[in-house]
From Swiss-Prot, chains A, B, C, D:
Organism: Azobacteroides pseudotrichonymphae genomovar. CFP2
Gene3D superfamilies assigned: Chorismate synthase AroC (3.60.150.10)
Family annotation (Pfam families): Chorismate_synt (PF01264)
Family: Belongs to the chorismate synthase family.
Name of this protein: Chorismate synthase
Catalysis performed (reactions): 5-O-(1-carboxyvinyl)-3-phosphoshikimate = chorismate + phosphate
Cofactor, free-text remark: Reduced FMN (FMNH(2)).
SUPFAM superfamilies per UniProt: Chorismate synthase, AroC
Length: 354, 354, 354, 354
């Protein structure tokens, strides 16, 4: 399905080689000043070809708002927006018309849809994320007014891992390198790895860490409305994701309960807080007021510039050589998408309560 | 919220110390023979006190169906069912009336609900899973008829890890030990660890692995209806979960793309299959026909039989001693819950297509 | 489907000849005092056999709450409730096992469900309304605290019509007669008509009028979330309904626009109000603060104590004689159901805003 | 809210004086040939200024598809479409910036939205129906392939009423006059009435009748998923509607049950059919296979070219004179909208079953 959210809802449309990508945001509160520069800036962050690490596609996507805004503010009606598709090299994909690319969605799509658009991955392509980032930017603007800040960064590429806690990391460094890792030493190593992988025509995966700061207590519902489940659903809807964990996550299994509890105490201001935050800001599915932090694992992207053996629709084996422009590592580009999905999810739950 | 699913929908109700736990299943196809023994058997699997590993609560929950069934078959109308609450020791919890148990949902619930039921964790308690297991059992019955089999087992407890691929594991061993690990050697080590942790009044977490075999190709939708996102949402809705990954998951980050692609070929029967299954049976959010396998991480349970420092509603520090009956490790009991959530999710997507 | 509402949600279950009828209410705010007498009283109002007009079924339905309530107040968790089925004469229906009753749902159900429960109409029976009335009673309690009052009454039976505006009617008279018409003269005529129809073994239909007083301005959304559409959907979900209109409705067609506009003016208290209320309290799909009033048309009930020619499942013509206990006119019994559906709808929209 | 449907879903956006009107259709099956001429033709039918009866606004709306279509067929992905707004006279509305037009949505909108777009009624304007008609056209194309035909016509204007049953009416006459009434004699009278009303600067309402032919048995669900409830919800979502009834509707109250039952018999082909169709093709909320027929009542449009007394935002009384271009009767233009809503509803339920 193509709609995300319950109250703040994004319905997206558009194939990467169709006429336009776009979306409709329903449930956006009225009276929000729309900072167009900020929205366009977020969209620019996701573009490939913005650094030496990524491909040269150099898409300059300008978002156009068609409704829902009057005199610079939202009016509470659905916000329709589009980004025209240009600069898409359809011919790069012509050799792929009848071929199933390994680990791509082609085979599953063919089985499902029969008549489908083979060009550029149709709706499984990363260009579909444009709509997410536009809606996410608007969500961020609204959350910022409530003192809620969403920050994501690359914390692992292949075997290169930033193992420090987010508390010890300087967020202002994130945008200083193309790889969006806030530890400049580790960032260098990551860049070197990506370059070498690229030269070999291979790809590499990694992990993005995200922190949601200032989320008030009480968002989420026990049982089936857990905020942790909603965040995992949001992250796992991003292309190329393979895993999600929050708080101590998969690594926390090595701790005993006595080593992993967040003990309550009353602080200097008389407020009830916890000494630690192993839970990652969510207890029993409901936000606790502490920082929410989680990780998203991304697989190595499946388009290789190496040759690969595969089959076409009739089952004949063929050697696949893909020309064109592809990424050795999607992690840096995925950072704004993770932030967008987090912003939309948090806002959706926020509006449910307030 | 308290409803799970889009077509095969479970709405659950009931607090652990209220009158009854129950649910309503809507969207169950008509004409399914309801194997009552099987359903009751699944419910028995989740019971504590069934082995030396778990607590002595010894709840014998008998499910009672109130509607939706006629002459032993489903009739397509909503299936209402209840399990009466007995054998709940309310007095065990009386010392907790005004106290926030560390890493429990108490504090977040108090902030959210004001007037809430402190006894036994209300709806955040594991007893709420009764409804999930009943609905999951019915879902399994329906899937079995379509040749779809769901199997889960404990693959990690603390540092003890069953690292073999599921392909090399013998499922018939799962129920042979209390810890539900199919490798009997590893199972022994797990049991020893749990016993020692229990004696110290501490708790330990772990990982459950789940395989969905025989899922046809085409379930799921790209963008926001990905089957991977739905499964993660379902698993993360279970109490005490901290993470989800599928296919090569978090561990796959160490592979390059060239080492992680599932290459297509035509097999002896002329069918198009893959040589490997790093994707875990889901490509681009849609099932590929291969086995779907995923992991769910559980944190160490938060109720300790050790004393702990905490605060009460007025912020006064108090020493918490919890009497009663608690689990050092919830993993074995969570296995039928993971299977239930998987069955309901797969069935929901199955009914969407067929 | 078996769920009604978006925020205040009722999921109902139960066949009239099954074990129990019941429901789960999700989204009920916490802290509401549950006036059990009031709820049981509303349920008693819908019972047949409470007057000389209706049949002698004499069902005494006692509602039992299973969850969601602690120390007499709602706790914000789902409220599960049941009413056990007794006093249902299954044998009255044995002659109907393979026969399609004219204008009943039998034929359509058979075509749809294959294996279905023929006894007493299964889920198409009026007993399914028990769940609606319980949830409606709770909704009324919540609305009353906000100064919102829902009142319905019978305004037409066959050709006997109460044509006065609701403004000129005395609501305290509604419960004074079995027919629930607030004009005692007209009520007498209605009763006489129903008696004569009953003696002939025939049935008659009518109209119920409903007023929602004190609904604040702003409930509803333009386009697809119109409060008028929601109310019509709610009313048309009641068995035997054939039509809905509000404000001047179908009769207003005879007016010109100049005769039908509600002109604004500022009243003595300085508040902006309208001189008239042809719109029926809803403008552009949003409540205006004025009384919402609407009508629901009910067809004559389809079970006749006269013989009727029909066919069985094999298409053979047979003469249908129905024994048992049936109503010549369902209008009086439908009054609490109309109020319940109105209360649930208004509350659902109220909670969306506040 | 701005989304209609459960499976075949339309999300619409756009204010009449904004940049564009548009929508996204999700859930459209793949492989449907999109007859662009037919879609544009349906859109042309709703335009004002196409006859001497309506206003001279002369909007020529051309729909543009942005996604979801490849080589002329739908591909199963969301279909995004827009219609650019031009030819909207903003200045006609400048006198209205702070004034509440009687029986318009202005007052309720102001109360609800604070900051809203006063020009042309924003989203409460009839231009929003563009999206409905585009989606409805596509729905009709799909239904036609299944042998399902939707036909609507004007059956009443003011006191002029076409009282014949739809069975005796010649549908080929509908488009022969501007008023879209299939009885040419009655049509003349209706046109005369509308002209005279227009000269007086007044407005008049009426009724549209709609027939859905060829709907298979089994669409709809008892309880809350009744097809009759869904149709009423769809119709009542149209601007200016005041009532809905189907089958014998409000007029059927005058019949006794014995005079209103549809008796079953086996016809020459051995098929089980009914002798009559008082039920209007829906029994117990489920389609019976017979023609579904219903009526929708429209109030006289609220914009008058006569002066009217009203208040502005500060409560000061002012005399309202509206310049511009307005309709004395919206009924003819509403015919394609009624058909669109019926088509979308029937298709939604059809896809649920098949």
């Amino acid at each position: 399905m193509n709609t995300f959210g319950n109250i703040f809802k994004l319905t997206s449309f558009g194939e990467s080689h169709g006429t336009a990508i776009g979306g409709v945001i329903d449930g956006c509160p009225a009276g929000i000043v729309l900072d167009m520069e900020f929205v366009q800036g977020e969209l620019d962050k996701r573009r490939p070809g913005q650094s030496e690490l990524t491909t040269s596609r150099n898409e300059s996507d300008k978002v156009e708002f068609l409704s829902g805004i009057y005199e610079g503010k939202t009016i509470g009606t659905p916000i329709g927006f589009i980004v025209w598709n240009n600069n898409q090299h359809s011919s790069d994909y012509d050799s792929l018309k009848n071929v199933f690319r390994p680990s791509h969605a082609d085979y599953t799509y063919f089985q499902k849809y029969r008549h489908y658009d083979h060009r550029g991955g149709g709706r499984s392509s990363a260009r579909e994320t444009i709509a997410r980032v536009v809606a996410g930017a608007i969500a961020k603007l609204i959350l910022q007014k409530k003192g809620i800040k969403i920050t994501a960064y690359v914390s692992q590429v292949g075997d290169i891992c930033l193992s420090k806690s987010y508390i010890q990391v300087d967020f202002s460094n994130i945008e200083k390198t193309a790889v969006r890792c806030p530890d400049l030493e580790i960032a260098k190593q990551m860049i070197a790895l990506i370059q070498s992988v690229r030269l070999r025509g291979d790809t590499v995966g990694g992990v993005i860490t995200c922190i949601c700061h200032g989320v008030p207590v009480g968002l989420g519902n026990p049982v089936f409305g857990k905020l942790s489940a909603a965040l995992s659903n949001a992250m796992m809807s991003i292309n190329a994701t393979k895993g999600f964990d929050y708080g101590m996550g998969f690594n926390g299994i090595h701790r005993k309960g006595s080593e992993a509890n967040d003990l309550y105490y009353r602080n200097k201001d008389g407020k009830i807080v916890t000494k630690s935050n192993y839970s990652g800001g969510i207890q029993g599915g409901i936000s606790s007021g502490e920082d929410i932090y989680f990780r998203v694992a991304f697989k190595p992207v499946a388009t290789l510039l190496q040759g690969q053996l595969t089959v076409d629709k009739d089952g004949n084996e063929i050697q696949l050589e893909v020309k064109g422009r592809h990424d050795p590592c999607v992690l840096p580009r995925a950072v704004p998408i993770v932030e967008s999905m987090a912003a939309m999810t948090i806002l959706d739950y926020y509006l449910y309560n307030y």
